[in-house]
Amino acid sequence: MKTLIRSLTALAVGGLALSLAACGSSSAPQASSADGLSTLKVGTIGITSDAAIELAKSKGYFKEEGLNVETSVVANPPAGVAAAQSGQLDLTYAPSIPMLNALAQGVNVKAVAAADGYSDDAMGASDLTLIDDTALIVGKDSPITSVRDLEGKTISLPARKAQLEVTIASAMKKAGGDPAKINWIVLDFNSAVQSLAQGRIDAAGLVAPFTSKAVEAGGKVISSPGIEFFEKGAVGLWLAGDKTTSDKPEQLQAFARAINKANAYANEHTDEAQDLAAKVTDTPLDVVQNSTMTYWPTEVRLEDLKRVDQALAELGYLDKEVNIDDSLIFGAK
């Protein structure tokens, strides 16, 4: 069995001033459904880690907890965070980086449960490409062999000041390079794979299954920036805003119980999880099976979030540490 890992959380962008049209409705979430279940509206971004929330639906875990969970795809994590903070969504998917960016801007959110991440022994793997579903990839005939060689080069990302940029910048700094000398450009993943194959960019920051597509086209992985940055623990999170944490604490606790159960099931039943991941991402099953597989943590630990907070400040992506504490984690005692 493949070593399990998380699914990408790298679709985030750096700001919150984004359209919320993708959230599907401007009305506030409804409290209950016709069958007496409490309804929670949840924003996702259509990535492989969504398999766990789909498992919680299909296995009846949410229903067992008295919940009717309605999911909709938002444009990106910051848009989801803004929708959750305003009450348009009850919960939303977001990695720890956009969460910390939001907190630094005074947006109050809480982490309710883990959505994806790394196992505690992930860094001990002999091949980090089996652990990390993000990758920095150069073209087939590129002379570049190290992230250190990318000064003055052009690297594509799905968004600026977001997870892939942060993790690649961190890897470059550790290698003795200067991330400020990189020419970052924004390309969606499909365009990035094509541009890399055509030699129009020097490297691309990608996420599975696009990493596999780039390698199939002759690309070469020179860095696994995600695992090197996060090391272990939850990366993607299910977040709730002030309104939901105040108005629906019991429902959020129920959601956490159900999703933790689904996360544990997904880790033990990878075939089912991969099948759902293929459907969620509209990707051929064989491509998903040949990509690194998601790891779904069953807890959110403050220590893991603090490492990210400190790193963002050290890299200059935050003016200073947010100085988070246990109150960030919903239900923490």
Description of each model-found segment:
Residues E64, S119-T129, I227-F230, W296-E303, ...:
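Short, solvent-exposed loop/beta-turn-alpha elements that line the ligand-binding surface or hinge
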Residues M1-L11:
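Bacterial N-terminal signal peptides that target proteins for export
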Residues G36-L40, K63-V74, Q88-D90, K173-L187, ...:
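A local structural motif
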Residues S246-Y317:
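Secondary-structure end/capping motifs
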Residues G24-S26:
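Bacterial signal peptide processing site
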Residues L18-A22:
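C-terminal motif of bacterial Sec signal peptides marking the signal peptidase cleavage site
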Residues I97, A180-Q274:
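Pocket-lining segment of extracytoplasmic ligand-binding domains
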Residues S33-S170, K174:
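Short, glycine-/small- and polar/acidic-enriched structural segments
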